[in-house]
């Protein structure tokens, strides 16, 4: 709604305003410095043909300019670019492992990626049984790349929750 009002105000009396601007006096050439005037007079007196050359129109150049044909095309709109981007190769997917965490929302996982639950599970398995859950086994089990698995095992760890008893009470030891 606001665009209609702005467009109406912008286009109001447009022709009269344009004609007024066109009919204004054109700006005159800036005055030359006095030292430049003397140099120009000296050069024109030495080379009088230059003054005629400046005022003369070059017919050959004008014919070249008339032969110039400019063919332009609008840039590709963003909608066409987005449409081209959406046409990608279909990715390979796999089903999530171990459905015991009630992962209702996750139907499939792209190959080379894992869910949060799977990441926590494999990190915990590797921490508890490092000789069984090696990087190679994790790579094969979850279809990941070797460098990703190595980085995951190197830089991520699961939390250990330890509850320390208050210092004034004795801890109950389990048998």
UniProtKB/Swiss-Prot annotation:
Subcellular location, record wording? Mitochondrion; Membrane
Which GO molecular function annotations are given, in alphabetical order? calmodulin binding
User: Which residue(s) hold a covalent lipid per the annotation (N-myristoyl glycine)?
Assistant: 2
Identify the GO cellular component terms for this protein.
Answer: cytosol; mitochondrial inner membrane; mitochondrial membrane; mitochondrion
Signal peptide (from-to):
none
Keywords, A to Z? Calmodulin-binding, Disease variant, Host-virus interaction, Lipoprotein, Membrane, Mitochondrion, Myristate, Phosphoprotein, Primary mitochondrial disease
Q: Name one Pfam family in it.
A: UPF0240
> Its membrane topology, per UniProt?
Lipid-anchor
User: What does the record say about induction?
Assistant: Expression is low in quiescent cells and is induced in exponentially proliferating cultures. Expression is also induced when prolactin is added to stationary cells. Induced by dietary differentiating agents such as butyrate and retinoic acid.
Phosphoserine, modified sites: 35
Its PTM note reads: Phosphorylated on serine. Prolactin stimulate serine phosphorylation.
- Effect of altering residue 73 to A? Reduces interaction with calmodulin. Does not promote MMP-9 secretion
Biological processes, Gene Ontology terms: defense response to virus; mitochondrial respiratory chain complex I assembly
Q: Which disease is it linked to?
A: Mitochondrial complex I deficiency, nuclear type 15: A form of mitochondrial complex I deficiency, the most common biochemical signature of mitochondrial disorders, a group of highly heterogeneous conditions characterized by defective oxidative phosphorylation, which collectively affects 1 in 5-10000 live births. Clinical disorders have variable severity, ranging from lethal neonatal disease to adult-onset neurodegenerative disorders.
Q: Which family does it belong to?
A: Belongs to the NDUFAF4 family.
Q: How does it assemble?
A: Binds calmodulin. Interacts with NDUFAF3. (Microbial infection) Interacts with the vesicular stomatitis virus matrix protein/M; the interaction inhibits viral propagation.
Spell out the protein name for this chain.
NADH dehydrogenase [ubiquinone] 1 alpha subcomplex assembly factor 4
This protein's species is Homo sapiens (Human)
Record gene name: NDUFAF4
